[in-house]
A protein has these predicted regions:
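Helical segment within the ABC ATPase nucleotide-binding domain
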Residues: 59-71
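Conserved ABC ATPase signature
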Residues: 19-23
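Catalytic Walker B motif of ABC-type/P-loop ATPase nucleotide-binding domains
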Residues: 44-47
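H-loop/switch region of ABC-family ATPase nucleotide-binding domains
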Residues: 80-81
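Conserved ABC ATPase "signature" region
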Residues: 1-15, 63-66
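A short, surface-exposed alpha-helical micro-motif characterized by mixed small hydrophobic
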Residues: 86-88
Length: 139
């Protein structure tokens, strides 16, 4: 009964009876969310839910996460590198580096935070912009 409820809630009834090897990576992620519903876990940890998932299924997974949060009260803690996906689902966003909180805020605040840019993109990007400004100033 709980399995059927999860399949219906996630609109994946068509996957009932399929073996794990017969479904795509994104469909497996949806089945994992259904399994979470079966044990009624209220805090769910997700690791790279978007890895290897096409954009259409990622949107479906995002919709399912939002519904589980709003309609069932689930809380999600995610490790994810797709900031567009995170920005759609999470507020606040917390970025960690070397085991410490580096920044906290909205996705747009995080994406423009100098510390985050330096930690994850390196100083090369900032130096490139500075060198471009210097080249333009001396011309």
């Amino acid at each position: 009964a709980k399995a059927d409820e999860g399949l219906e809630f996630l609109s994946i009834e068509h996957l009932a009876g399929h073996k794990a090897g017969q479904v795509s990576g994104g469909q497996k992620k949806l089945l994992e969310l259904g399994r979470t519903m079966m044990v009624d876990a209220r805090i769910v940890f997700l690791d790279e839910v978007g890895a290897g998932v096409n954009r259409t299924l990622l949107n479906t997974i995002g919709d399912a996460i939002l519904r589980l949060n709003k309609e069932r009260g689930y809380t999600f803690c995610m490790i994810e590198h797709d900031m567009d996906f995170i920005g759609r689902l999470c507020d606040p966003v917390i970025v960690m580096a070397e085991g410490k909180v580096l920044a906290e805020g909205s996705a747009s605040q995080i994406m423009s935070d100098e510390r985050v840019i330096e930690a994850y993109l390196g100083t090369g990007l900032k130096n490139k912009d500075k060198n471009k400004d210097k080249a333009g100033a001396s011309a």
